[in-house]
Amino acid sequence: MAAKISRFDIHDELTAPPESAPILKGALSGTGKLNNFVGVLASSPAALRGYARMRSELRRGTLPGATQERIALAVAEYRGSEYDVAVHARAGRAVGLDLDEIDSARRFHSRDEREAALLRYLQTMLENSGVVPVHLHEEAREHGWTDEQILEALAHVALADFSSLVTLAGEIPLEGTSREVKPLKKVA
C-alpha cells in the first residue's frame, strides 16, 4: 500500500515559518513529537495560534475530558474524518472511555443519559445548521448541563469541526497507527 501524502506541507520545528515556532516548541515539550495535523497548521501561523488558543482555553473549561472526547469523536465521525476519529479514539481511551462508549460517541450516543442528552443536542445543531428545538435545549438543562457547559460544548464542536475540515481538505495521513479506523456508515 502506497504511503498517503498530505495536500499541505507537513512541517516540523525546522521547516515551519518562524512565527509558528513558539507553538511548535510548546507542542514538542508536551509529547516530544508533532502530529501531522499540527505540522500542517504550522504553514499558517495565524491558524495555528487560533487553534492552539481555543484548544487551550477549552481544556481549562468546565467540561470533563471524557465529554470533550465524546464531542470530538461525534464530530469527526459526522464529518467522515478518519484521522480525527483515530486521534480521538486514542484520547478517549486515555480519559477512561471504553471501546463501546467510543463507538457510541461516534454515533452521538452514550450509555450515560446526561452525556446522551448533550450529544443529541449537538447532533441536531449540526444537522440543522445551528438550529436546535427548544425541547432539546430543555432536555440538556434537565440533565444538569448549564448554559456555560452548553456553550463550551458548542465551542468544542467548532474546534473539532475545524480540525476535521483541515484533515479532510488536506488528506492528512495518520501517523503511528497499526490499523485504520474507518468511519461508520451514516449517523442514525
Predicted segments, located by residue:
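Hydrophobic alpha-helical segments
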Residues: 1-188
